[in-house]
């Protein structure tokens, strides 16, 4: 396929390797954010793992927009590695689907800002049922952080988007922290290859 401009001409690159250089810049931003995330891990992460290991119900993951898409993957990772989990859309939760949440569940709420309205409204409703709440957001002094039992902070997450708007670095951090949680819990359960195979 040959793309042409409005005058029917094949455009030429005036800035060789510009796209590659931009991609490298964006990857560096994400890699740097992941490196900084190491410094945010402390006993709070251990508390989060313990909360999930002691959970007698399911890990109910929730998030809006791109954070919700990341939440779906985190939930799937938990489910395939020995921790019963489901994803709950926060908008639907406030229109009846909150009935999926049980007292013995842990709600894992994702929001970069910690102020996503749908997620913030869901958390106290889940707490009123008796569920525990674990949040991944930044910073902890936010409406979501103040409602949660445990907060895992994203830390500094400047987006790779040139406009500073599209979730990029923040969603990478959410996914990495979610994966780290799932893998730590997997080890805590002594989850085996045979058990993993049974789910596949």
Regions found by a protein language model. Give the residues of each.
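Glycine-rich phosphate-binding loops that contact phosphosugars or nucleotide phosphates
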Residues: 57-176, 180-186
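An N-terminal, well-structured beta->alpha segment
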Residues: 5, 9-12, 16-57
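Long, charged amphipathic helices and adjacent flexible linkers at domain junctions
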Residues: 192-200
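Short, Lys/Arg-enriched N-terminal segments with co-localized hydrophobic residues
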Residues: 1-3
């Amino acid at each position: 396929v040959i793309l042409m401009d409005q005058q029917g001409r094949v455009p030429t690159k005036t800035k060789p390797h510009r796209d590659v250089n931009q991609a490298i810049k964006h990857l560096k931003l994400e890699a740097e954010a992941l490196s900084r995330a190491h410094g945010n891990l402390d006993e709070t992460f251990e508390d989060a793992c313990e909360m999930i290991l002691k959970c007698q119900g399911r890990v109910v993951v929730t998030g809006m927009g791109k954070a919700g898409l990341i939440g779906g993957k985190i939930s799937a990772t938990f489910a395939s590695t020995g921790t019963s989990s489901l994803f709950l859309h926060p908008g639907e939760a406030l229109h009846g689907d909150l009935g999926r949440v049980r007292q013995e569940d842990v709600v894992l709420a994702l929001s970069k800002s910690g102020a996503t309205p749908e997620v913030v409204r869901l958390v106290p409703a889940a707490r009123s049922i008796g569920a525990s709440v674990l949040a991944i957001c930044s910073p902890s002094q936010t409406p979501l952080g103040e409602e949660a039992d445990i907060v895992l902070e994203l830390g500094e997450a400047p987006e790779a988007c040139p406009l500073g708007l599209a979730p990029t670095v923040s969603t990478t951090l959410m996914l990495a922290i979610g994966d780290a949680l799932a893998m730590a819990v997997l080890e805590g359960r002594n989850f085996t290859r045979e058990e993993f195979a049974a789910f596949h």
